[in-house]
Amino acid sequence: LLFVLISVAANGQQAKYVFYFIGDGMGVNQVNGTEMYQAELQNGRIGVEPLLFTQFPVATMATTFSATNSVTDSAAAGTALATGKKTYNSAISVGEDKNPIETVAEKAKKAGKKVGVTTSVSVDHATPAAFYAHQADRNMNYEIAVDLTKANFDFYAGGGFLKPDKTYDKKDAPNIFPIFEEAGYTVARGYSDYKAKSKDAGKMILIQEEGKDPSCLPYAIDRKSDDLTLAQITESAI
């Protein structure tokens, strides 16, 4: 996000889109290792082959401890990335006092922008959830999914939903998909279904086809021709 805004300011141009990419667990070592591997692919060259984003005009470092732990988890890290505030491990965009913290995505929506949240894992996973939900525990998957409708963003996409009809305290609950539809969302299962429905849809939720693992998209090495991909999700969001 910072990179896009600074580049626009430097060039005096108006940005059509702002993309905020998060590599979950992707630290300096992972990036450097990838650049070394890219160089190795070039006839065994020693050194690094820079990735596109490491050549952006601005880069910075961030601390990775949470408010309560030396090692953060995805929930506290996602909250920090979404709100700029540190919180306790397992928190989804709430502070240590359990009160909600407004996210950058919510600010964009209030400013009249269209907003989408996409992921390669489940839509109710801690990292994407931190941008639209406010819950005391990352495992409150059903409650997080309900918050999706409250945020009222324009597009959500990912593997699926982990607990579509079971609350955090393991009680039966109304299935989440009719709730989505009542809130004005068109649910598409798979890329073909998305293409068939998107022309007549307003707000949309794109997930994998029925029967596929909702926890994440298939890894590239295991991917079948009809599996939903992150590239398709990104194209759909745009």
Predicted segments — roles?
Residues 3-11:
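Hydrophobic h-region of N-terminal signal peptides that target proteins for export
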